[in-house]
């Protein structure tokens, strides 16, 4: 039986790359438009398999406690609670990097537009 080696950093890296792609694909040019892209990336990166969920929660980079207790789902299903916690941490961490990713994209767009002139 193979053990899951998924860490929070693996999940975050995947979400980060998805956010980067979302910014480019949706041609996001304003921080006000980042909300949907961040939540889409976080939602897609949250693991679904029990072993992966427990592995992520056991890894460094994520606390057990919710930052906003209002986000804790009203359920006794431990898996859903852990997934919600991973999702919350991903959105927090992605927001920290989102502006840098957006600025990087805007610089690329500006260079491309200057080259076309």
Swiss-Prot record:
Keywords for the protein's UniProt record, in alphabetical order: Early protein, Host-virus interaction, Inhibition of host innate immune response by virus, Restriction-modification system evasion by virus, Viral immunoevasion
Gene3D superfamilies according to UniProt: DNA mimic ocr
Role according to the record: Prevents both degradation and modification of T7 DNA by the host restriction-modification complex. Structural mimic of the phosphate backbone of B-form DNA that binds to and completely occupies the DNA-binding sites of all known families of the complex type I DNA restriction enzymes. Thereby, inhibits the restriction endonuclease activity and protects the phage genome as it penetrates into host cytoplasm. Inhibits host transcription by binding to the bacterial RNAP and competing with sigma factors. Inhibits the host exclusion defense system BREX.
Keyword Signal: no
The keyword Chaperone belongs to this UniProt entry's keyword annotation: no
One GO-annotated biological process of the protein: symbiont-mediated suppression of host innate immune response
Subunit and interaction comment: Homodimer. Interacts with HsdM (AC P08957), the M subunit of host type I methyltransferase restriction enzyme M.EcoKI; 1 Ocr dimer binds to M.EcoKI. Interacts with HsdR (AC P08956), the R subunit of host type I bifunctional endonuclease and methyltransferase restriction enzyme R.EcoKI; 2 Ocr dimers binds to R.EcoKI. Interacts with host PglX/BrxX (AC P0DUF9); this interaction inhibits the enzymatic activity of PglX/BrxX through high-affinity binding. Forms a 2:2 tetrameric complex with phage T7 OCR.
Organism whose genome encodes this protein: Escherichia phage T7 (Bacteriophage T7)
Upper lineage: Viruses, Duplodnaviria, Heunggongvirae, Uroviricota, Caudoviricetes
Protein name per Swiss-Prot or TrEMBL: Protein Ocr
């Amino acid at each position: 039986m193979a053990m899951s080696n998924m860490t929070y950093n693996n999940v975050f890296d995947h979400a980060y790359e998805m956010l980067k792609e979302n910014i480019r694909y949706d041609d996001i040019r304003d921080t006000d438009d980042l909300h949907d892209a961040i939540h889409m990336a976080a939602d897609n990166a949250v693991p679904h398999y029990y072993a992966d969920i427990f592995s992520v929660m056991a890894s460094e980079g994520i606390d057990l406690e919710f930052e906003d207790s209002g986000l804790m789902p009203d359920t006794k299903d431990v898996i859903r609670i852990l997934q919600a916690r991973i999702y919350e941490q991903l959105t927090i961490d992605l927001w920290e990097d989102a502006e840098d990713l957006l600025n990087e994209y805007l610089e690329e767009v500006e260079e491309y537009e200057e080259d076309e002139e």
